[in-house]
């Protein structure tokens, strides 16, 4: 109710504010690579502490118009480059030209993280050590899901504990999987039931970055964060783009294949006030028998995922964000995979249907020093299962799990422009 009321009040307020916001205070310029001198496309240009931002176009140029008056900081950031900040004084009817050069960042210390203190903080200034897996790591390693990407993070190990069903758990500092808290967009909706097979169910193409914080974080994230915290940040729309890809991988050089098809699309309105990012994945992996004994070492998988993340800037000082994902997965391990599970000697078969999402409303004060957020997230998991041996007809089961959370957060920044 509070969230709906806030949105209604803000939308009602937005029209009047937009009329008053024709300040004609503008900033334009270009962004260059410091080493090569080439123009850089798709660089994020943000007015720090606000919801205002854009990206450079194909020629490396950008334009921000009708900005609020006052002293602000412009940030220029992109994957693989050090963040550059420029102080600006915006005045009514004045247009500024600001050109910048970006330098490659080999160790990614200038990235922004949210897992250290629940607020956006430069990784360099974060009070605790936060390691980041970005989208580049998933692409370079050809990882198709979260589990495959986490293997490239120091101090983190993903291990398979069952050859029949392929159950995987993540270990941080040697502790078992239940001692690690997994978050989606900083929300603890990834339940114990989802966590059993969830590492393979989250596709890489929905992930913007993964923040890994090793060590206890119970004060911030609850009693499950004893070994550490893994925070999955989903992708936001940045520019109009689309991508369709398919990979075919032979498992062990045999006739068992892993087929993976992904779809991504990003749509942003011309004025930058609304955006939508769509993602989808269809994966099929054959069951794999390494030693020829008739029992699988890797289970058969069929996985379909679809979802989106969108935002709407309801005014200059407010933003509404919505995320949704749907996952279907079938997995079967054991022997005699072409028969019903109760006719096999050993069989573990699971069918998952997962629906989850979140809604967040951010409201800033006019000087952007005060920020108030209201949020809610939920995830529902339905699982049909069979765990049995010796052709047991009574080994079928069904499990349902619903996780819902809601909250509010207030933040005050006393050093907004430094």
Report each predicted region and the residues it spans.
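Short acidic/polar hinge/loop motifs at secondary-structure boundaries
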Residues: 65, 169-171, 187-214, 235
């Amino acid at each position: 109710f509070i969230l709906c009321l806030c949105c209604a009040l803000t939308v009602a307020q937005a029209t009047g504010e937009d009329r008053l916001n024709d300040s004609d205070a503008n900033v334009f310029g270009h962004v260059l690579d410091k080493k090569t001198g080439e123009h850089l496309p798709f660089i994020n240009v943000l007015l720090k502490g606000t919801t205002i931002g854009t990206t450079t176009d194909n020629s490396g140029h950008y334009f921000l118009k009708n900005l609020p008056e006052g002293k602000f900081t412009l940030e220029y950031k992109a994957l693989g480059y050090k963040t550059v900040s420029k102080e600006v004084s915006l005045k009514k009817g004045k247009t500024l030209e600001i050109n910048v050069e970006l330098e490659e960042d080999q160790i990614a210390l200038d990235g922004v993280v949210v897992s250290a203190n629940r607020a956006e903080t430069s990784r360099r200034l974060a009070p605790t050590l936060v390691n980041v897996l970005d989208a580049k790591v998933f692409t370079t390693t050809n990882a198709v899901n979260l589990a495959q990407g986490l293997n490239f993070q120091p101090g983190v190990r993903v291990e398979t504990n069952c050859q029949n069903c392929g159950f995987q758990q993540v270990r941080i500092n040697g502790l078992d999987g239940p001692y690690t808290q997994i978050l989606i967009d900083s929300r603890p909706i990834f339940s114990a039931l989802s966590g059993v097979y969830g590492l393979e169910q989250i596709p890489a193409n929905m992930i913007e970055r993964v923040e890994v914080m090793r060590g206890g974080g119970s004060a911030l994230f609850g009693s499950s964060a004893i070994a550490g915290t893994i925070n999955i940040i989903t992708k936001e729309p940045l520019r109009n783009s689309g991508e369709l890809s398919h990979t075919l991988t032979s498992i062990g050089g045999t006739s068992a294949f892993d087929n993976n098809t992904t779809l991504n699309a990003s749509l942003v309105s011309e004025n930058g006030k609304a955006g939508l990012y769509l993602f989808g994945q269809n994966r099929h992996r054959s069951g794999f028998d390494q030693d020829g004994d008739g029992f699988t070492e890797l289970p058969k998988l069929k996985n379909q995922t679809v979802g989106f993340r969108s935002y709407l800037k309801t005014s200059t000082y407010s933003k509404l964000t919505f995320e949704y994902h749907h996952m279907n997965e079938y997995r079967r391990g054991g022997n005699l995979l072409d028969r019903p599970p109760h006719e096999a000697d050993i069989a573990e078969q699971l069918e998952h249907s997962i629906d989850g999402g979140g809604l967040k409303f951010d409201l800033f004060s006019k000087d952007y020093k005060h920020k108030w957020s209201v949020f809610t997230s939920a995830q529902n998991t339905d699982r049909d299962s069979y765990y049995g041996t010796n052709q047991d007809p009574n080994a079928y089961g069904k499990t349902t799990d619903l996780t819902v959370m809601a909250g509010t957060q207030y933040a005050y920044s006393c050093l907004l422009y430094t």
